[in-house]
């Protein structure tokens, strides 16, 4: 009678049309997974799984190196980075490599070196991946017990977690050392329009650093995305780096507490689901960060934020019309509100027109023109610098309006080329990928919990009444 219904009731993988198909010596019968399930076939083969992960890392680093060199080869120094579809060079520039005052690219050689180093690293990782996939031991527990593990070994799992946390902490400290001792980083707030600057006095005050975490994520509060100076950015990395390292050693030298042993599912698929959730959360934060923040993501490299481009337009026409004789303080727009300047709900002098909605936007090119009560009328009449005019005019025509697939954009280029601001690419892609990773988390978390409960292969139907009923035909 059991042959009357599909074996899929009992097995959570599809049955192959050709059950003799064997890929890499891992058939469905011996692993419970078909060839397209990929690394799932290697769940209990730590040596082969190591090979898969090292090879995967090699592919990632190869892409980084190859794309890096591709961007270097196509880079035009006379044009802003955000006009050239670049997504890697802006990050290197923000770290202070190859740039000078105003974000001008002075030397592309550091970018070339970065690409070559990534390619060399990818070759080493690729060799290691092939070796461990084809030649190395299938399992590591016997030959290399330090690198071996069992998914249900809770102490070993938290030790591995601790090692990862220490490595992440070292990564955070690498940025700190670069900013403080190895040439500095690019600071968009440096006087005169931004420059590479050594961060000599990072913020150590925990009330400031953790104050960001306690802020509301809504409206003008902005949670950690509201950080607006490099001292706080580097100070935050000191705190998070130190916390990660301390937490890492804690997990290395301790065993999980009883409540943790009870609360978590301890299996390979459960750890995968936890990781996917973490990456998803980071992707969502990154999407909002790159969309709104112009300190960590300087507009000189990533293009203006939406509010910044809007305010830049108001500023550009204020400058133009003031030169033509307009009285910027008293001129009225079609609605009776100030055409160039008006007051915010709390009394500050702000730009007028539609950009009033972005009245609390902060950007390096406009902050020098503010006084104790918003924009300073005297400074607007007498102290506007040429670099501020040039930058606002550039930002006005490069708003982040395009979509992920380049539809839309701003038709400000000749030859019908629509511009897509890198912030559009980075924010949209991270949001979409963050969503996919979250769905992956739900999928694998559900499977892991079902497996822990003992019914991942379907509920036992031996006692169902339908089994004793007459067949339909």
Swiss-Prot record:
SUPFAM superfamilies from the UniProt entry: Photosystem II antenna protein-like (SSF161077)
Main location: plastid
GO process annotations (BP): photosynthetic electron transport in photosystem II
Record's subcellular location: Plastid, Chloroplast thylakoid membrane
Membrane topology per record: Multi-pass membrane protein
Known function: One of the components of the core complex of photosystem II (PSII). It binds chlorophyll and helps catalyze the primary light-induced photochemical processes of PSII. PSII is a light-driven water:plastoquinone oxidoreductase, using light energy to abstract electrons from H(2)O, generating O(2) and a proton gradient subsequently used for ATP formation.
Subunit-level organization: PSII is composed of 1 copy each of membrane proteins PsbA, PsbB, PsbC, PsbD, PsbE, PsbF, PsbH, PsbI, PsbJ, PsbK, PsbL, PsbM, PsbT, PsbX, PsbY, PsbZ, Psb30/Ycf12, at least 3 peripheral proteins of the oxygen-evolving complex and a large number of cofactors. It forms dimeric complexes.
Protein name: Photosystem II CP43 reaction center protein
Organism of provenance: Ostreococcus tauri
Gene coding for it: psbC
């Amino acid at each position: 009678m059991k042959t009357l219904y599909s074996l899929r009731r009992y097995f959570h993988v599809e049955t192959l049309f050709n059950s003799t198909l064997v890929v890499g010596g891992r058939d469905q019968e011996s692993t419970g997974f078909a060839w397209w399930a990929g690394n799932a076939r290697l769940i209990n083969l730590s040596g082969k799984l190591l090979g898969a992960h090292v090879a995967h890392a090699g592919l990632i680093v190869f892409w980084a190196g190859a794309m890096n060199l591709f961007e270097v080869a196509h880079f035009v120094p006379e044009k802003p980075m955000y006009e050239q579809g670049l997504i890697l060079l802006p990050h290197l520039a923000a770290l202070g490599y190859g740039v000078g005052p105003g974000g001008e690219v002075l030397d592309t050689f550091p970018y070339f070196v970065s690409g070559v180093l990534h390619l060399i690293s990818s070759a080493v990782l690729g060799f290691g991946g092939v070796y461990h996939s084809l030649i190395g031991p299938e399992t590591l527990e016997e030959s290399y017990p330090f690198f071996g593990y069992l998914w249900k070994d809770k102490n070993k799992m938290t030790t591995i977690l601790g090692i990862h946390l220490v490595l992440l902490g070292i990564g955070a400290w690498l940025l700190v050392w670069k900013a403080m001792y190895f040439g500095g980083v690019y600071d968009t707030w440096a006087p005169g329009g931004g420059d590479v600057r050594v961060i000599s006095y990072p913020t150590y005050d925990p009330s400031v650093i953790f104050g960001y975490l306690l802020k509301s994520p809504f409206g003008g509060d902005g949670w950690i995305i509201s950080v607006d100076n490099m001292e706080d950015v580097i100070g935050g990395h000191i705190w998070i780096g130190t916390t990660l390292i301390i937490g890492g050693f804690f997990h290395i030298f301790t065993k999980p507490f009883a409540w943790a042993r009870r609360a978590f599912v301890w299996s390979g698929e459960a750890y995968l689901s936890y990781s996917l959730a973490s990456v998803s959360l980071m992707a969502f934060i990154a999407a909002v960060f790159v969309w709104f923040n112009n300190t960590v993501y300087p507009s000189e490299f990533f293009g203006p934020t939406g509010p910044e481009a809007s305010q830049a337009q108001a500023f550009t026409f204020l400058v133009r019309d003031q030169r033509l004789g307009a009285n910027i303080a008293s001129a009225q727009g079609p609605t009776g509100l100030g055409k160039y300047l008006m007051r915010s709900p709390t009394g500050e002098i702000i730009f007028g027109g539609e950009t009033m909605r972005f009245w609390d936007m902060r950007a390096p090119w406009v902050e020098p023109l503010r006084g104790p009560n918003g924009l300073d009328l005297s400074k607007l009449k007498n102290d506007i610098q040429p670099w501020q005019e040039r930058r606002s005019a550039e930002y006005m025509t490069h708003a982040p309006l395009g979509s992920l697939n380049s539809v839309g954009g701003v038709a400000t280029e000749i030859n019908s080329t629509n511009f897509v601001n890198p912030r559009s690419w980075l924010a949209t892609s991270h949001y979409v990928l963050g969503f996919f990773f979250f769905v992956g988390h739900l999928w694998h978390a559900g499977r892991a919990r079902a497996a822990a409960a003992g019914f991942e292969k379907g509920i036992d139907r031996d006692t169902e009444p339908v089994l004793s009923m007459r067949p339909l035909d």
